[in-house]
């Protein structure tokens, strides 16, 4: 086989494999809140500090398998403004409908980066998280992290706005 043919076959194989790992093409909802100041106040406190995170993630994965949705693991803490802004955005009616249609969501309290690190480690994230919220989008069938390298992109949510959060989530919906 010539080098050119080998290169052409390798390129074709890569092109066929790319859609399997590329973000999805789902239209995001139009969010009614123009800014975070439009969200309900006080912002939600979504993380249960006493919950058994391993059991919660396992139960959520089972629900995702049964409903053919992606698993969305939201790692954060109630002390984190960006985490609470994400939760407040997800609580908007149009976002709630969108998220419920595409994901099974589980929130996991990470304390002050000193709890439930095994959840992130299970999906290949080594060491301490770079920021929160860390959002892991998982294929429940393979238990594979679909947004590897992008899990902490919402850690500065306050600089994004509600529509940008909706757009980000839509990238990973199926």
Segments predicted by a language model, with ranges:
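Non-catalytic, surface beta->alpha helical segment in thiol-disulfide oxidoreductase systems
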Residues: 129-174
